[in-house]
A protein has these predicted regions:
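Non-catalytic alpha-helical scaffold/packing segments enriched in small hydrophobic residues
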Residues: 71, 154-157
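Surface-exposed, charge/polar-rich loops and edge strands
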Residues: 1-13, 17, 24-28, 79, ...
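Short, charged low-complexity linear motifs
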Residues: 40, 137-140
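Short glycine-rich anion-binding loops that position phosphate/pyrophosphate groups of nucleotides
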Residues: 63-65, 139-143
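Short linear sequence motifs
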Residues: 44, 147-148
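N-terminal active-site beta-alpha-beta segment that forms phosphate/nucleotide-binding
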Residues: 2-130
Length: 194
C-alpha cells in the first residue's frame, strides 16, 4: 500500500516532469508556427457555440512562448464583446477590462502587457451574471477539460470563485443563469492523454 504522502509526492513529481516537458515544447515553437496556430485558434474560438452569445470574453495576454491571443482578442473586440484580461492581485488573479491602448501597457517580468494597477477589476459576482467565454491558459490540457497550469493555482482559485458566485446567484433566483464556458486555449500539441 502506498502511503498518502508518497502518493502526493508521486503526483507532484509527475506534474513537475510534465511541466518541464511542456515548457520545452513551447520554447521550440517557431514564430511561423505560432502565427499560423494563433490565427487557427482564434478562428476555432470564434466558431465555438458559446461565442455568439458571449457578452464577455476572458482572455489572457500571452507570454512569448504561448499561443498568441492577440488575434482572438481583436476578433472579440471587433464583434463588440467586452474583453477582460488577468492581473495578479496578491495571491489571486482579477480580471480587468481591456483598454483600447492595451498594446502600449508596460510589460511585466513575463514580457506580457500588464494592466495598470489602478484599473478596476470586474468582481466574480459580476462575471457570474454575464454570458462569458473564458479562454484559459495552461501548459497541458486533456480532452475531458483537465489542465495543467504553471503551478500557482491562480486560475483554479478564480474559476472556483466564479462557480461559487454562480451558485449563490442561482440560490437567490429561480431564473436561468448566464452561461459561463471555460475552454483551454493553447496549441493542439498541448493536448495530452488524461
Amino acid at each position: 500500500m502506498i502511503a498518502p504522502d508518497e502518493g502526493r509526492r508521486d503526483v507532484a513529481a509527475l506534474k513537475a516532469a510534465l511541466r518541464k516537458s511542456a515548457k520545452a515544447a513551447l520554447a521550440a515553437v517557431t514564430p511561423e508556427r505560432r502565427a499560423v496556430a494563433s490565427a487557427d485558434a482564434a478562428a476555432r474560438a470564434s466558431a465555438h457555440p458559446a461565442w455568439p452569445g458571449a457578452e464577455l470574453v476572458l482572455a489572457f495576454l500571452s507570454m512569448p512562448s504561448e499561443i498568441d491571443t492577440a488575434p482572438v482578442v481583436e476578433a472579440a473586440l471587433a464583434a463588440g464583446k467586452r474583453v477582460a484580461v488577468p492581473r495578479i492581485d496578491g495571491g489571486d488573479i482579477a480580471f480587468v477590462e481591456l483598454a483600447p491602448d492595451w498594446r502600449a501597457w508596460p510589460r511585466d517580468r513575463w514580457d506580457i502587457p500588464a494592466p495598470p494597477a489602478e484599473a478596476p477589476s470586474i468582481p466574480p459576482a459580476e462575471i457570474a451574471g454575464l454570458a462569458t467565454l473564458a479562454l484559459v491558459p495552461g501548459l497541458a490540457f486533456d480532452r475531458t477539460g483537465g489542465r495543467l497550469g504553471r503551478g500557482k493555482g491562480y486560475y483554479d482559485r478564480f474559476l472556483a470563485s466564479v462557480a461559487a458566485a454562480r451558485s449563490a446567484a442561482a440560490a437567490r433566483s429561480s431564473g436561468p443563469s448566464s452561461p459561463f464556458v471555460a475552454i483551454g486555449y493553447g496549441y493542439e500539441s498541448q493536448i495530452v492523454d488524461s
